[in-house]
UniProtKB/Swiss-Prot annotation:
The gene is prpR. GO terms for molecular function: ATP binding; ATP hydrolysis activity; cis-regulatory region sequence-specific DNA binding; DNA-binding transcription activator activity; phosphorelay response regulator activity. It comes from the Bacteria. Involved in the transcriptional regulation of the propionate catabolism operon. This is Propionate catabolism operon regulatory protein.
Length: 541
C-alpha cells in the first residue's frame, strides 16, 4: 500500500534518495523528482552498471544515502552489488499497453523487449488488433543488442522497452517507444519514501497533531446500493466512538479505505480539532513481513536489543500512532506469539520496547482488518479468542462486489471515464451504450478481486479504446479483451466460493502463483495459505 507522507520539518530530517539512470529515464526522474523535493533530498546519478556501482561506493564513503531508485537490468545490477536498499521501477500493465498503443499507431510490426522474461498476457492484445508483435527478453547489454538486431532482421519497425532498449533501437534506425510512465516513476518515489520511513524512523520526530496522514474519507466510499448506504451509516455511527474496530472483507473490497474513513470522520467530529491536522493514521500489513521484524515495527526496540539494532533504539508504530489510529491489516496472519504481546498492549494501554523494561503509555485506537474467517482460525488454534474479542468491539463487514450488482455498471462507467480522461479521450455515448450492452457479462462474473479487479479491467479497456475509439463492444470483442468474464460463472455455495474463485484466477495464469497473487493484490504467501485452507475446507465437506 502507498502511505501518504507529511513533509519533514527541516532538511536534516529529510530522507536522502539517489536516482540512478541514463538517457530517457534520467529525464523522467528529473521531472518527477521536483514533486518530491519537499519530502526528500534527491540526487540524480546519470550512470549505469559498473560505472554507477564504482561511483556510488566512493560517494557513500563521505555521504549518506537511504535508498536508490533504478530500473531494469541496471537496477538489478545495482541491487546485487550494493548494501543499501534499491527500489526497482517495474512497468505496470497499463504502461505496457499504453506503449504498445502508441507503437500501434505508427506500425503494425512491433517488438517488445523486457528484462529477464516476456509477457504472455500480451497475446490477447496482438490478436484483437491484428498486430505482428514479437517479444524478446534480455539480461545483459550484449544480449539486448542481439535481440534488437534480430528484431530488425525480422522486419520489426518499432520497439517498446526501457532506456537501454530504446537507445539500442534508435541506434539500429528503428522507432523506439519508452515503456515507463510518469505514474510508475512517481510510485517508485512513494515506495522509496516508505522504505526510508521504516529504516530511519528513530531519526524522525512526530509532534502531536502531525505524522502520517490519510488519503481517504467517507465521501470516497462509492456506490448507491443499499449495502453501501448501510456501510456509510455504520461508519458514521462507529466514528462516535474510539473503540476497536474489526473490518472483514475479501481482497479488493476497500478495507483500508473504510479504516481511514472511520479515522477521519471521528476526528472531524471533535470541535477542538477544527482547522487542525488530523492525528496520525499509521498502517502496517501483518502478513507482509517476518515475525521478528513485525515485533520491532509494532513495539519498537532499545539500543542493543539485537544484533544490528540502531543506536538509541527506535520508536514502534504504537508510539508513532499515539493520539491517533493504528491500522493492522491482515491481522489474521499475525503469528501467535505476537498476538499475546498485542493483547497485553491493548489491555494495559502501554507498550514495552523489545529489549526494554519501562512501559510507555500509549493512547491509540486500533482498527484491524482481515479477509480470513477468524472464527474458523480460532477453532483451529491459529488465533487467540481473547484477542479477537478485544479487537472486535465494533465489527464491520464489507460486501463483495458480486453482492452489490446495482453498483457494478456505474462503477465500471466511472473507472472507464477516469482512465479515458487520463489519456484525453472522450467518453462517448457509443462507448456508454457498448458498456451497457456488456452488463450481463459484468454481472455474471464473481469478481474475486472486487473493486480493484474492476478498476484494472476498465484501465485495460481504456487502452484498447485509445487505439480504436469506436469498436463494437460485443461479446466477441469482450472475449478477446477480457477473457476472465467468459469463465464459467455457475453459482457456488458460500463455503466454496473463495476457493473456486482463487482456482479460476490461478487457471487464468496457467498455475503461475506469483502472477495470480499480483493480480489479486495479495502476497504469494497469502495466496498459498488461502489455497491450502480452501482445499482443506472442501476435503472436510
Amino acid at each position: 500500500m502507498t502511505t501518504a507522507h507529511s513533509a519533514p520539518r527541516d532538511n536534516s530530517d529529510k530522507p536522502v534518495i539517489w536516482t540512478v539512470s541514463v538517457t530517457r529515464l534520467f529525464e523522467l526522474f528529473r521531472d518527477i523528482s521536483l514533486e518530491f523535493d519537499h519530502l526528500a533530498t534527491i540526487t540524480p546519478i546519470q550512470l549505469g552498471f559498473e560505472k554507477a556501482v564504482t561511483y556510488i561506493r566512493k560517494k557513500l564513503a563521505t555521504e549518506r544515502c537511504d535508498a536508490i531508485i533504478a530500473a531494469g537490468s541496471n537496477g538489478a545490477y545495482l541491487k546485487s552489488r550494493l548494501s543499501i536498499p534499491v527500489i526497482l521501477i517495474k512497468p505496470s500493465g497499463f504502461d505496457v499497453l499504453q506503449a504498445l498503443a502508441k507503437a500501434g499507431k505508427l506500425t503494425s510490426s512491433i517488438g517488445i523487449v523486457t528484462y529477464q522474461e516476456t509477457i504472455p498476457a500480451l497475446l490477447a492484445f496482438q490478436k484483437t488488433f491484428h498486430l505482428r508483435l514479437e517479444q524478446r527478453s534480455y539480461v545483459t547489454e550484449e544480449d539486448a543488442r542481439g535481440q534488437i538486431n534480430e528484431l530488425k532482421a525480422n522486419g520489426i519497425e518499432a520497439v517498446v522497452g526501457a532506456g537501454l532498449i530504446t537507445d539500442l533501437a534508435e541506434e539500429a534506425g528503428m522507432t523506439a517507444i519508452f515503456i515507463y510512465s510518469a505514474a510508475t516513476v512517481r510510485q517508485a518515489f512513494h515506495d522509496a519514501l516508505d522504505m526510508t520511513r521504516l529504516t530511519r524512523r528513530q531519526r524522525v520526530d512526530y509532534p502531536s497533531g502531525k505524522g502520517l496522514q490519510t488519503r481517504y474519507e467517507l465521501g470516497d466510499i462509492r456506490g448507491q446500493s443499499p449495502q453501501m448506504e448501510q456501510l456509510r451509516q455504520t461508519i458514521t455511527l462507529y466514528a462516535r466512538s474510539r473503540a476497536a474496530v474489526l473490518i472483514q472483507g475479501e481482497t479488493g473490497t476497500g478495507k483500508e479505505l473504510a479504516a481511514q474513513a472511520i479515522h477521519q470522520t471521528f476526528f472531524h467530529r471533535q470541535p477542538h480539532r477544527q482547522n487542525k491536522p488530523s492525528p496520525p493514521f499509521v498502517a502496517v500489513n501483518c502478513g507482509a513481513i517476518t515475525e521478528s521484524l513485525l515485533e520491532a515495527e509494532l513495539f519498537g526496540y532499545e539500543e542493543g536489543a539485537f544484533t544490528g539494532s540502531r543506536r538509541g533504539g527506535r520508536a514502534g508504530l504504537f508510539e508513532i500512532a499515539h493520539g491517533g489510529t493504528l491500522f493492522l491489516d491482515e491481522i489474521g496472519e499475525m503469528p501467535l506469539p505476537l498476538q499475546t504481546r498485542l493483547l497485553r498492549v491493548l489491555e494495559e494501554k502501554a507498550v514495552t520496547r523489545v529489549g526494554g523494561h519501562q512501559p510507555i503509555p500509549v493512547d491509540v485506537r486500533v482498527i484491524s482488518a482481515t479477509h480470513c474467517d477468524l472464527d474458523r482460525e480460532i477453532m483451529q488454534g491459529r488465533f487467540r479468542p481473547d484477542l479477537f474479542y478485544r479487537l472486535s468491539i465494533l465489527r464491520l463487514t464489507l460486501p463483495p462486489l458480486r453482492e452489490r450488482q446495482a453498483d457494478i455498471l456505474p462503477l465500471a462507467e466511472s473507472f472507464l471515464k477516469q482512465s479515458l480522461a487520463a489519456m484525453e479521450i472522450p467518453f462517448t455515448e457509443s462507448i456508454r451504450h457498448g458498456l451497457t450492452q456488456c452488463q450481463p457479462l459484468l454481472l455474471a462474473w464473481r469478481w474475486p478481486g472486487n473493486i480493484r479487479e474492476l478498476r484494472n479491467m476498465m484501465e485495460r479497456l481504456a487502452l484498447f479504446l485509445s487505439v480504436d475509439p469506436a469498436p463494437t463492444l460485443d461479446r466477441q470483442f469482450m472475449r478477446q479483451l477480457l477473457p476472465e468474464l467468459m469463465v464459467n460463472t455457475a453459482e457456488l455455495t458460500p463455503s466454496t466460493v473463495d476457493a473456486n474463485a482463487l482456482q479460476d484466477v490461478l487457471a487464468r495464469f496457467k498455475g503461475d502463483k506469483t502472477a495470480a497473487a499480483r493480480y489479486l493484490g495479495i502476497s504469494r504467501t497469502t495466496l498459498w495459505r488461502r489455497l491450502k485452507a480452501g482445499a482443506k475446507d472442501q476435503s472436510d465437506n
